[in-house]
């Protein structure tokens, strides 16, 4: 396992300026909002050359000071790009934002590390905080105000002497909020990890006095031990909310384990009605007293994201990024989404309108069950990544940062791009040398795939229309329905609770968890799942019989799928039975173990002309007769396919259904094998061949089919991580959803989620999904209380209505859809018996 602690650092952009004040030294009742970064895309994957090369330590705090960038950390030396001349800079430096040239006029001397930098109360000033005690020989215990142009100490700001280090600061109005590991802010001022200062004079005030107490993990006997207090502060851009994370259990004596939210009122900061127990678990308590590492607010004030270390402990928020809704209230709150690294530390987070940027010691994301390895759903991301704000899944942005070192310890989103600080020298796989600080410009970035969906009234597309077939019956004897993989009809269910109407009573069912092998008699495309269930006839009573109505004079093939799966009859001669067709024995003394072998699926095809029904009887000889599946297929050439595999109808969502119009599909998706589809933002996503595929579609023209495989990246899959087992690379692992696709009967996209139904299952399921990268969430969820989907042949949603196509009848039914939950009952709105419209198809979706 690779969990490393970075020297702590960082920034918080000032959310207000002193110019917003009406009276010097007082916060306004309604603070002016900070400007949002205004991003309309993710930043470029190629870093700018306009940054210097920091030669040692790490860059842990970055501040955009207009024409300059000011960086703090644990470094002591820097070089201009393309120079080998060291420039001494102890823990703090400034450089030109346009050229990257080190500022020769700004060279303050500090005696220890800088952990945070933010704007000062007036133009051309900047606050710095950290471990230091002197600046330019002037005593400044942990916090100072400097002149941006000269690096001189602004002596009018005379802060108290904090008795411990300051981890983070934030300017709100004319107050400087301070968080760290301290118990006093000057001798007469007890403060437990949080304090507020007059931003002009430095005087301690009584605005923020919340006291943080008790170690998270250290209990006096066991666990790692660290100082108690605040690690990071995040202020909402409107200046009304403060989130504090750190090593503490209580805030003002009330349990707020590692995180507390504070309301920033006009005259006092008070603990908000916001609490969660999700950061209570100890996780790797031997190594970490606290495992929260960074927090950032969204530009619209609506949510914040917390990132952590702590090792991979199932069911916890260790080694995760988690989104929390700022407007939520109460106790026992839960995150909106969680992204798991599967064993690696997150260190930093920055948020734009389009992405949640995270950094750390990462190898993968979407890796819920990973333990220092890539498990189902894992997507390789070396150290830095961009997440979809709606669901936390990785977007396509993937420049990487390898080697990873301790990790990317700082992320700062600005109107022009993204700054990343850390302890290593390269962006990409030794691709772009950017020593310890890099800038990804917004210019040249890529727009995130739209998440707009089509609505009704509008168009409904049916792709893979039911084709004429010679298959008359398919039954999965003893099991639930199984999706066809050959374009034909599905295999109908025959369970104990819902037995097939085509056999008599008195037989029983058995199930097996391991797959059988298949011999050469089994037709290609036959689902192997058929052999996981059987219907057998115990001794005594009438023999097991099956009867299928077939028009008189029709010649058919009767196909019996069988396998000996029971270990007690594994040997030849231990299970023998006869099969009679139309009263005559056609399989005499059938011994499956002798004929095919134990745990081997086989098939016997019998040809007969119907006299009005096909009658089968399974007769005892020794042990119990059995059958796994029955298929009846009319002989002769297959019927001609329908003229167009795709058609569109107008539909108002109620009762007005338009006539079908064909849609040309020149690129030739085999829609007959599709496992439904949905349209989002100009792209149709559909299941086929055990995977998701995507095609652009504008309502008239389909683009070329493209396999959706974000779990493998030609650039990164062969790059060795230098962690874990020898030779481990950043290659991901295909999502578990792909194994479900052969049984998917319907799917739609809504609110960052992919909802879907499964063959033979009554519920409605969902996973997170981002159309930008095509990543499907590693975790499957079930919509609580949803039922009635066992007969679904398609599902789609429009506004507050959920629609379901009945695959047995072709009816279209609807129900209310409120907050991602369907109402209890469906009402038929259209169908063959209602208006003559058959809604069945392999893929049914609302589109442009």
Task: Write out the residue ranges for each language-model feature.
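Hydrophobic core
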Residues: 16-27
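Extracellular/periplasmic catalytic domains that process cell-envelope and extracellular macromolecules
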Residues: 63, 350-351, 466-469, 608-610, ...
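Short, low-complexity, Pro/Ser/Thr/Gly-rich segments in the mature regions of secreted, periplasmic
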Residues: 841-847
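Compositionally biased, intrinsically disordered or flexible polar/acidic segments
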Residues: 454-640
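Extracytoplasmic surface signature
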Residues: 2-4, 11-12, 27, 31-462, ...
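Primarily extracytoplasmic ectodomains and periplasmic/lumenal surface modules that are beta-strand-rich
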Residues: 68-69, 481-484, 685
């Amino acid at each position: 396992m690779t969990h490393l602690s970075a020297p702590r650092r960082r920034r918080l952009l000032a959310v207000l300026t002193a110019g917003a004040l009406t009276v010097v030294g007082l916060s306004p009742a309604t603070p002016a909002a900070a400007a949002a970064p205004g991003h309309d895309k993710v930043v470029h994957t190629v870093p700018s050359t306009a940054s210097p090369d920091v030669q040692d330590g790490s860059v842990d705090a970055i501040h955009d000071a207009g024409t300059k960038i000011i960086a703090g950390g644990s470094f002591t030396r820097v070089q201009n790009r393309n120079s080998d001349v060291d420039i001494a800079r102890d823990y703090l430096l400034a450089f030109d934002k346009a050229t990257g040239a080190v500022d020769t006029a700004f060279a303050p001397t500090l005696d220890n590390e800088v952990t945070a930098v933010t704007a000062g109360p007036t133009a051309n000033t900047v606050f710095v905080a950290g471990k230091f005690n002197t600046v330019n020989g002037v005593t400044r215990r942990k916090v100072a105000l400097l002149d941006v142009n000269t690096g001189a100490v602004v002596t009018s700001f005379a802060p108290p002497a904090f008795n411990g280090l300051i981890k983070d600061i934030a300017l709100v109005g004319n107050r400087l909020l301070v968080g760290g590991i301290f118990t006093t802010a000057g001798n007469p001022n007890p403060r437990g990890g949080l304090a507020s200062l007059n931003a002009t004079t430095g005087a301690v005030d009584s605005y923020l006095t919340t006291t943080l107490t008790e170690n998270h993990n250290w209990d006096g006997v066991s666990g790692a031990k660290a100082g108690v207090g605040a690690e990071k502060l995040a202020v909402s851009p409107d200046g009304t909310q403060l989130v504090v994370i750190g090593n503490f259990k209580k805030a003002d004596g009330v349990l707020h384990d590692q995180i507390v939210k504070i309301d920033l009122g006009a005259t006092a900061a008070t603990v908000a009605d916001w609490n969660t127990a999700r950061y209570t678990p100890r996780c790797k308590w031997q190594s970490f007293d606290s495992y929260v590492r960074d927090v950032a607010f969204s530009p619209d004030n609506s949510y914040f994201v917390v990132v952590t270390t702590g090792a991979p402990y199932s069911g916890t928020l260790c080694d995760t990024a988690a989104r929390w809704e700022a407007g939520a209230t109460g106790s026992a709150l839960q995150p909106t989404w969680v992204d798991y690294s599967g064993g690696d530390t997150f260190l930093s987070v920055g948020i734009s309108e389009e992405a949640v940027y995270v950094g750390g010691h990462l190898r993968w994301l979407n890796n819920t069950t990973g333990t220092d390895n890539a498990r189902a759903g894992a997507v390789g991301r070396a150290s830095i990544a961009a997440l979809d704000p709606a669901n936390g899944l990785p977007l396509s942005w993937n420049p990487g940062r390898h080697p990873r070192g301790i990790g990317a310890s700082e992320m700062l989103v600005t109107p022009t791009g993204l700054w990343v600080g850390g302890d290593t020298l390269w962006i990409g796989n030794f691709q772009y040398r950017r020593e310890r600080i890099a800038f990804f410009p917004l210019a040249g970035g890529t727009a995130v795939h739209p998440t707009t969906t089509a609505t009704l009234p509008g168009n409904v597309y049916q792709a893979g229309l039911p084709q004429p077939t010679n298959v008359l019956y398919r039954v999965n004897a003893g099991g639930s329905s199984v999706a066809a993989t050959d374009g034909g009809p599905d295999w109908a269910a025959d369970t104990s609770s819902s037995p097939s109407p085509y056999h008599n009573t008195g037989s029983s069912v058995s199930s097996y968890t391991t797959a059988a092998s298949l011999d050469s008699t089994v037709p290609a495309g036959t689902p192997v799942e058929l052999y996981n269930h059987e219907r057998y006839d115990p001794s005594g009573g009438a023999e097991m019989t099956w009867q299928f109505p077939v028009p008189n004079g029709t010649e058919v093939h009767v196909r019996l799928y069988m396998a000996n799966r029971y270990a007690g009859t594994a040997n030849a001669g231990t299970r023998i039975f006869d099969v009679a067709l139309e009263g005559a024995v056609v399989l005499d003394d059938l011994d499956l173990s002798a004929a095919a072998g134990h745990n081997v699926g086989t098939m016997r095809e019998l040809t007969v002309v119907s006299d009005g029904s096909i009658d089968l009887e399974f007769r005892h000889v020794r042990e119990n007769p059995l059958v796994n599946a029955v298929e009846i297929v009319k002989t002769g050439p297959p019927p001609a396919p329908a003229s167009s595999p795709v058609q569109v109808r107008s539909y108002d969502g109620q009762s007005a259904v338009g006539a079908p119009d064909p849609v040309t599909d020149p690129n030739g998706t085999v829609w007959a094998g599709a496992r439904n589809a949905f349209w989002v933002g100009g792209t149709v996503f559909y299941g086929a061949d055990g995977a998701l595929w995507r095609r652009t579609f504008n309502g008239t023209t389909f683009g070329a089919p493209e396999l959706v495989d974000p779990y493998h990246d030609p650039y990164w899959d062969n790059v060795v991580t230098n962690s874990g087992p020898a030779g481990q690379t950043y290659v991901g692992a295909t999502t578990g959803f792909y194994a479900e696709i052969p049984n998917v009967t319907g799917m739609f996209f809504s609110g960052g989620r992919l909802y879907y139904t499964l063959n033979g299952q009554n519920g409605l399921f969902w996973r997170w999904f981002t159309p930008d990268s095509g990543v499907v969430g590693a975790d499957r969820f079930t919509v609580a209380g949803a039922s009635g989907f066992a007969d679904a042949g398609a599902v789609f949603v429009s506004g507050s209505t959920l629609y379901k196509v009945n695959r047995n009848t072709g009816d279209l039914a609807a129900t209310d859809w409120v907050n991602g939950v369907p109402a209890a009952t469906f009402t038929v709105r259209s169908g063959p018996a209602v208006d003559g419209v058959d809604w069945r198809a392999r893929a049914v979706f609302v589109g442009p």
